[in-house]
Amino acid sequence: MPKVSIVEKSQFFAKAVVEGVPPSLINSLRRVIISELPVLAIDSVVVVNNTSVMYDEMLAHRLGLIPLTTPLKDLPPIEDCESGLVDPSECTVRLTLQVNATGDVVVYAGDLVADRPDVAPVYKDIPIVKLVEGQSVVVEAYAKLGRARDHAKWQAALASYYYYPKVVVKREECREMCKEVCRNLENPLECTFNKATTCKEMCGGGIVVEWEKDKYVFWIESFGNYDAETALREAFRILKKKFEDFLDALSRKAEAKL
């Protein structure tokens, strides 16, 4: 029976011990989190005026890499946006950037203004370009829902896991030898499998390192587009839909042979 124990949780980070699931399933979840989660990112830019020293192309590139808050519950499912089931405007948000320098000034991500109040740069202090007196930047940008499998600017989070290690200390002097690498050898959350293996190599046969089958330490960290819990829920939704689509395709194939 699958079991999950939360070890650490904050707005943008979560760590848990997961038991009773095969590695293929937990790895599928990891891959969905890394490459399939939808987020808003600037995808097209209209440069109205740019008298800064930065080329228009470089300016557009920088704007595209600024993470934006993404209110998933108020946006269509990414599948509907990709398939054209909804109007493209429902999957797009317009942003403007207008800065006229009256002295030396730095243009920041926080100067971007979206048409929607629930969409804004996650980190407002990201510098975009420097201006001197008399220079200006006026830009109209369009952010759309996308996935990291198409471009890294649409990546919402990182996720990883490692097997739950089981460490047996046969010689007490090994604890002192491994103190700098791992202070508590028997604590799998503090002493990861890699750290335990390093200690094993340092101490020879004084430490035995194994792992528990179908038990892992899993963590996820959001880039701030939405919180870690939302990222996990969306990842499970996408993974479930993939299974459903696979079963539907399999059923149609079987029916066609009858």
UniProtKB/Swiss-Prot annotation:
GO terms for cellular component: cytoplasm; DNA-directed RNA polymerase complex. It comes from Pyrobaculum calidifontis (strain DSM 21063 / JCM 11548 / VA1). The gene is rpo3. Keywords: Cytoplasm, DNA-directed RNA polymerase, Nucleotidyltransferase, Transcription, Transferase. It catalyses: RNA(n) + a ribonucleoside 5'-triphosphate = RNA(n+1) + diphosphate. Its main location: cytoplasm. One of its GO terms (biological process) is DNA-templated transcription. Belongs to the archaeal Rpo3/eukaryotic RPB3 RNA polymerase subunit family. Pfam families: RNA_pol_A_bac, RNA_pol_L. Its EC number is 2.7.7.6. Gene3D superfamilies: 3.30.70.3110, DNA-directed RNA polymerase, insert domain (2.170.120.12), RNA polymerase, RBP11-like subunit (3.30.1360.10). This is DNA-directed RNA polymerase subunit Rpo3. It is found in: Cytoplasm. Part of the RNA polymerase complex. One of its GO terms (molecular function) is DNA binding. DNA-dependent RNA polymerase (RNAP) catalyzes the transcription of DNA into RNA using the four ribonucleoside triphosphates as substrates.
